[in-house]
Amino acid sequence: MRIFFFAYVLPTVISLLLGCQGAIAALGVDITKGNTEKVKISVAPMHSSTNLEKEIGKSCIRVMLRDLNSTGIFDASWKLPAGGFSTTSEGMPDSNAWTSVAKDVLVTGSIKEFAQGRVKVKLFIWDVASGRQLSGKSFNFATGNWRRAAHSMSDSIYSRITGEGGYFNTRIAYVAETGLPGSRRIAIMDQDGANNIYITGRGEFVSTPRFSPDARNLVYMSYAKSGGSVVLHDLETGYSTALGGVRGVNSSPRFSPDGRHVLLSESAQGSTNIYSIDLKSGKSTRLTNDRSINTSASYSPDKKSIVFNSDRSGRPQLYVMNADGTNQRRISSGKGGYSAPAWSPRGDWIAFTKTEGKSFHVGVMKPDGSGERLLAKGYMVDSPSWSPNGRVILFTQQDPPSATHPFRSRLVTVDITGTNTQILDVPTNASNAHWSPVLRE
């Protein structure tokens, strides 16, 4: 097999020479369509020399398997052939025993502590059918950051096989609540539910946390004072400040793609209108000006357009306008009401919540209003938020009240095809979630 003639020399060059599209074509992976047959990935134990290396390697693989299997397009497993499996000190296969368990893709690697409290993982991805190395990459990290490193490894595998960016090394901000008055807190966790922390204390009514494009800051609504205010929170320093510039009751804050502006809605004198706040100067610019309710504004990724919902036609519908507020036009045309729009980071879709009769849906449509598709339905579903690669949607799902669960609100994801739904592991009831960009390694 040609696989054994590769050495760990210039893996990036090897990856470029082989090309991504050949592997994708061979495996038949198209994440924009519902895949009926999953790509089978076998992950081999990492070559290690010490107990510390061995345990971190095992922990990383467990996280990688969970990440990959959550996509609905992979069947990833940690298997060993009957005769055992061995790799070189660099993590390269040194026998053909792997062919008995690996069908589509084989992942091998090595882990080595190279300094006090720091390790290096070398990860290799192999195409089983051709016996070729698809990629090789190194990950250097502090031992305490092994989980984030594992998510980055998952991103590397996902990206190499699908040709799309990964979304595993990310965080989710949400509102943690019990359903009782005054029991809402802003919380942040990894996308798989790990490392949950609270940003705000108890007794403060808060809502709609939204990450900045660099994931260093949050904006959210706080109603600790009368009228409510938009709070800008620095996640690195813990410092919070209220945004000024707009009077009245504020709501629905969201960053611009470059992080220089925040969109929000202001309610005053019987109407609600959308403003843009320049974070450097504090200057506010009014973008809508009528007697209706205009809210939930979201920029397009190129910052040239804004989608929002408005009841100016009698019930909530989706509208798009230029970034300066001109050329406002309605894009939704189906039955029912539309709300909570969120523009995909790819620019190709707008996610929304739709109510029709007693039914709630999460769906997508193109920016011109065409191609509407409903992806998820529930007793009450709301607040869609995109993964950074624009292929998965996170939303809130509230279950009907029962004797055992008078209030139950969960975070759920659905892929762009509507075929793969996952319930996230969250320690409390949760709502109003927002997905961060991919974190820096």
Swiss-Prot record:
InterPro entries in alphabetical order: 6-blade_b-propeller_TolB-like, PD40, Tol-Pal_TolB, TolB_N
Principal cellular location given in the protein's record: periplasm
Gene3D superfamilies: TolB, C-terminal domain, TolB, N-terminal domain
Keyword field: Cell cycle, Cell division, Periplasm, Signal
Subcellular compartments: Periplasm
Leader peptide range in chain numbering: 1-25
Gene Ontology cellular component list: periplasmic space
Highest taxon, organism lineage: Bacteria
One of the protein's GO biological processes: protein import
Subunit structure: The Tol-Pal system is composed of five core proteins: the inner membrane proteins TolA, TolQ and TolR, the periplasmic protein TolB and the outer membrane protein Pal. They form a network linking the inner and outer membranes and the peptidoglycan layer.
Family: Belongs to the TolB family.
Function recorded in the entry: Part of the Tol-Pal system, which plays a role in outer membrane invagination during cell division and is important for maintaining outer membrane integrity.
Protein name: Tol-Pal system protein TolB
Lineage, top ranks: Bacteria, Pseudomonadati, Pseudomonadota, Alphaproteobacteria, Rickettsiales
Recorded name of the encoding gene: tolB
